[in-house]
Amino acid sequence: MLPTLGLLWLQPAANAQTVKITSLGSRTGEFCELDRNLLFEDPSGVRILYDPGVTIAGGTDPRLGEIHTILLTHVHNDHIGNQKLNQDPNAPTAGCTATAPQTLAPNFNLAEIAAAKNSAIIVGRNMATFVAVKIQNIRGVPTPGCPSAGLGNEMTVPRTTPCTINLGDGGKRTVTRFEGESGVQIAIVPALHDNTVSPSLASSNVILSDPLRTNLTDNGLPAIVGPPTGYVLTFTNGLKVYLTGDTGIMAEMDTLVNRFYQPSLAVVNVNAGNAALMGPEEAAFAMSRLVKPKAVIPLHMIEATTGGRVNPGTNTARFIALMGV
């Protein structure tokens, strides 16, 4: 179990190199209520941002650096980012609760970051066109699809413009710093979750335009943006990481993720066991009995730590205990 925020994964090999994993959360050194994202840096220099959420201050956040690729699991506000952070996460007074200062991001935090960093956005199915429009709203020009080459569907970064990649079931892409050299393989895997944009949460016609927005709202319907996804990342040092996204327990955790990909590390999204996604009991079962990684990072707990330590009596503490740590 790795409950801390600044993480280095050391692959035990003759020529070992590290994959750096960092949380860009509401408050540095804490696991806060709205923290959803992780930033992965491969030894080759490829940098991948996972589910940006609302705890990054848009594309100008100084913690970002280069962002070559952004992964999005689904379009719920806390993952795509209907708001962005409006505080210094390093300040001693920085908030760590759901009321931490934020400002509206009408085209989503993800699109602001991609437009500023010329990132390649990897998503499942219908989400690519939805995200492309949000980036176009910011840049004023259409957002192209990302190029690919070779048997591994390779794409070289950094790029000079943002682009989108639409992966279907079983799809893979490889992101590399230099053409012909090894890179990070990104494979899409299923998730069981809702993937809708609620028109009632849209404060303007930017998120959903009329007449679609009005027609959906008048009929009490959300906009469905294709199926949600998870990912398996294979880094150049051999490390494989399973990103569950928001999901319930599913057979593919065993048949596809464990048996085929065999990840060493899993990042599992956990909640209080309500209707949204797995609670600590379900998540512990999924990790220990189905996925069987060597280490686990819990995410999405909606609970703040204190002084970087897990608060007793919380779902985070319950999950750790169930994992036998």
Which role fits each region the language model picked out?
Residues 29-34, 57, 76-81, 127-132, ...:
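Active-site environment of divalent metal-dependent phosphoester hydrolases
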Residues 113-122, 126-181, 259, 280-325:
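Binuclear metal-ion centers of metallo-dependent hydrolases, dominated by the metallo-beta-lactamase
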Residues 19, 44-46, 66-67, 116-120, ...:
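Loop/turn elements at helix/coil->beta-strand transitions in domains of secreted/extracellular proteins
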Residues 9-16:
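Sec/Tat signal peptide C-region and signal peptidase I cleavage site
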Residues 265-287:
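Active-site-proximal segments of metal-dependent phosphoesterases and phosphodiesterases across multiple
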Residues 1-9:
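Bacterial N-terminal signal peptides
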